[in-house]
Structures are given as structure tokens and as C-alpha cells.
């Protein structure tokens, strides 16, 4: 079995490829942190160091927020690229469509997501760090 190498550009490529929004959310909010948590600290630092190219969509903010979030969880220095202005939204994006889930996202989103303006349902950010097994759309 070959080991998956976590490369953030994979998620930017998924955005550019036109994946459905639900698949992008699942990949960024579940798959990315699961794979990140499974890496040794040195490999995590390597992932953080390489910025994904910009897609010029709101997904750039969500990717940056997720990386900021997992970097803080693992006590890594924050990569400079997450502070690029293009990785912030001028208008807050609340991902869930269901009213009570939107309220939870607004009230309980972690600081990294609030800062970037992309608010997922915080229940998607479980302590396990995403899904237990690799997910392929």
C-alpha cells in the first residue's frame, strides 16, 4: 500500500476542477485535517511551509483557515502565506444552509475560521481530526 503524501495544492486543484461544494467541504474540513494529524511533526511543518496556489474563490479562505486551525492545534508556527489578503473574505461565508447549523457556525466557529471569514459547522471539526479512513470523491 502506498502512503498518501499530503500536498495542499491537491485541495486547490479540486476547487479548480469544479468539484461539487459538498465534496470540497468534506475534503477540506475532514480529509485535510485527518491526513495532517496522521503525519509526524516534521512532515506537518513541511506541509505548512508550502502555500497552495490561489483559486480566487472563497475556498482559498477556508483552506487557509483550516491550516491555521490545525497548525495551532499542533503548536506549529503559523505559515506566512495564511495572512495573504486574498485568503480572507470581505463578507463572511457561513457554510451550513440549515438555520440552527448556521447559528452554531456563527456562535462557535474557532478563531481561525472567524478571522478568515469562512464559518463551517463546528461539529465538522471533531477532536478526531476528520474521518477515520481515506475518502475519495
Q: Which ranges hold each PLM region?
A:
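Charged, helix-prone or intrinsically disordered regulatory segments positioned adjacent to compact structured domains
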Residues: 2-81
Amino acid at each position: 500500500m502506498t502512503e498518501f503524501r499530503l500536498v495542499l495544492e491537491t485541495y486547490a486543484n479540486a476547487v479548480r476542477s469544479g468539484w461539487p461544494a459538498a465534496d470540497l467541504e468534506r475534503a477540506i474540513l475532514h480529509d485535510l485535517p485527518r491526513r495532517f494529524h496522521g503525519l509526524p511533526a516534521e512532515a506537518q511543518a513541511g506541509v505548512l511551509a508550502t502555500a497552495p496556489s490561489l483559486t480566487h474563490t472563497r475556498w482559498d479562505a477556508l483552506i487557509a483557515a483550516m491550516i491555521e486551525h490545525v497548525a495551532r492545534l499542533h503548536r506549529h508556527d503559523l505559515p506566512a502565506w495564511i495572512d495573504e489578503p486574498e485568503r480572507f473574505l470581505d463578507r463572511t461565508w457561513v457554510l451550513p444552509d440549515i438555520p440552527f447549523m448556521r447559528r452554531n457556525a456563527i456562535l462557535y466557529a474557532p478563531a481561525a475560521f472567524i478571522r478568515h471569514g469562512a464559518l463551517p459547522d463546528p461539529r465538522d471539526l471533531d477532536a478526531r481530526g476528520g474521518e477515520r479512513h481515506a475518502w475519495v470523491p
